[in-house]
């Protein structure tokens, strides 16, 4: 692989280019009509069948029940059969962006009648899908070719008529092999993150499952922690600098995030300033899934407070035991025990006052806290590695395509 300049406009090569095994350059990229390398496939299904229904999304081709979370009921007459290794895309878009996905899931699958099915001939399918999904020039051109107002349509005829600079088949194969290795590495890392989180949930359930007091005595949460309501402020208090106000958006994956910060320029009493080892919790939100999200305040953070929809749980135990309890199923089962199917979008002090938790002796509790915190660090490092891999992939794609 070599960095190749194409700034003179004569040679069409990406900034990052592969070479032949003998070190020589591949031929320059040449303008090609997609219609020359696309072969449509038009077999459909009618009546009863045993095909899986797939959905094409920007996250890839997925089983419909995985995409929606449950099996959907549809009349599948006229759905398009998509053989293994063939490509599809949804021709309608709300923002002019389209996703091209290859069936690597099932030997017997169908997609909506709105999903055109085709295969690439004399071209590498993996390369072409990555190219169509990642090249800024491709995205821009396809958005222009799509027609419509609120929802635009990229017809199959328009797609086939589009022309792009493409490398020869041998170079496509090399780029595709490289991307497949990188994609496999990313998926392996993602699998590791999922496995670590699953194991952590198992640890939490094991530690915080003492409901009958056979192992440790239980206490009310209010006996070992204080609950502090957040700051109420008006839009006129918001400023470019001042006190940082922690909100639900500042909690991401169990840690603090500072991508979306709000500051207020007003006097904040000492009682409304966070301290090291505090637990910040989202206690009210329009989305129930966000209620109960927590993060540990890892260090002293001067000039930092929290919003009215948040709460600080301040432990009296001098360790992280309370933080881990607040992430356990034992805690959530008590908080939402009476919700049934109703949408409860807040946690009150009264609810927290009624929560109970097992309380081991000090030394045992510190061992538990250390074990769980060590595991949190493993998860954090694994997630950072995953993020770095995904950012590396994104940067490489910008340089691998013209």
Label for each model-derived stretch:
Residues 1-24, 181-221, 384-402:
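Short amphipathic coiled-coil heptad-repeat segments
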Residues 10, 109-114, 147-170, 303-309, ...:
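A short glycine-rich beta-alpha junction/loop motif
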Residues 13-45, 161, 169, 210-231, ...:
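Non-catalytic DNA-recognition/assembly elements of restriction-modification systems
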Residues 35-87, 222-234, 249-279, 302:
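Sequence-specific dsDNA recognition surfaces
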Residues 47-55, 144-145, 234-241, 338-339:
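Short coil/turn segments at secondary-structure boundaries
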Residues 67, 78-136, 143, 247-248, ...:
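A short beta-sheet element
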Residues 93, 178-180, 285, 371-373:
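Short, surface-exposed secondary-structure boundary micro-motifs
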Residues 171-174, 367:
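Short, solvent-exposed linear patches
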């Amino acid at each position: 692989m070599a960095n190749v300049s194409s700034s003179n406009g004569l040679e069409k090569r990406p900034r990052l280019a592969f070479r032949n095994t003998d070190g020589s350059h591949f031929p320059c990229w040449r303008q090609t009509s997609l219609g020359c390398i696309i072969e449509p496939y038009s077999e459909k299904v009618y009546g009863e069948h045993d095909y899986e229904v797939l959905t094409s999304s920007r996250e890839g081709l997925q089983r419909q029940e995985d995409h929606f979370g449950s099996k959907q009921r549809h009349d599948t007459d006229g759905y398009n059969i998509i053989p293994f290794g063939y490509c599809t895309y949804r021709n309608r878009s709300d923002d002019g962006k389209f996703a091209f996905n290859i069936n690597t899931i099932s030997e017997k699958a169908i997609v909506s009648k709105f999903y055109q099915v085709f295969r690439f001939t004399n071209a590498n399918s993996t390369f072409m899908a990555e190219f169509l999904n990642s090249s800024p020039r491709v995205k821009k051109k396809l958005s222009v070719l799509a027609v419509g107002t609120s929802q635009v349509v990229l017809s199959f005829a328009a797609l086939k008529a589009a022309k792009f600079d493409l490398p020869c088949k041998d170079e496509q194969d090399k780029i595709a092999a490289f991307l497949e290795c990188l994609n496999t590495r990313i998926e392996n890392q993602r699998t590791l993150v999922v496995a670590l989180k699953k194991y952590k949930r198992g640890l939490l359930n094991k530690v915080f499952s003492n409901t009958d007091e056979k192992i440790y005595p239980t206490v009310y949460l209010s006996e070992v922690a204080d609950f502090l309501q957040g700051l109420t402020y008006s839009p006129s208090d918001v400023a470019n600098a001042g006190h940082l106000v922690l909100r639900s958006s500042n909690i991401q994956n169990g840690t603090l995030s500072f991508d979306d910060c709000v500051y207020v320029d007003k006097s904040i009493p000492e009682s409304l300033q966070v301290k090291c080892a505090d637990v910040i919790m989202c206690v009210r939100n329009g989305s129930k899934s966000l209620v109960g999200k927590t993060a540990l305040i890892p260090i002293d953070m001067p000039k930092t407070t929290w919003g009215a929809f948040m709460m600080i749980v301040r432990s009296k135990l001098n360790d992280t035991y309370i933080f881990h309890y607040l992430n356990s199923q034992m805690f959530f089962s008590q908080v939402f025990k009476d919700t049934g199917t109703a949408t409860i979008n807040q946690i009150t002090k009264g609810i927290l006052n009624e929560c109970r938790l097992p309380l081991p002796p000090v030394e045992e509790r510190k061992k538990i806290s250390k074990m769980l915190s060590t595991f949190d660090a493993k998860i954090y490092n694994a997630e950072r590695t995953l993020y770095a891999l995904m950012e590396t992939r994104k940067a490489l794609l910008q340089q691998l395509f013209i």
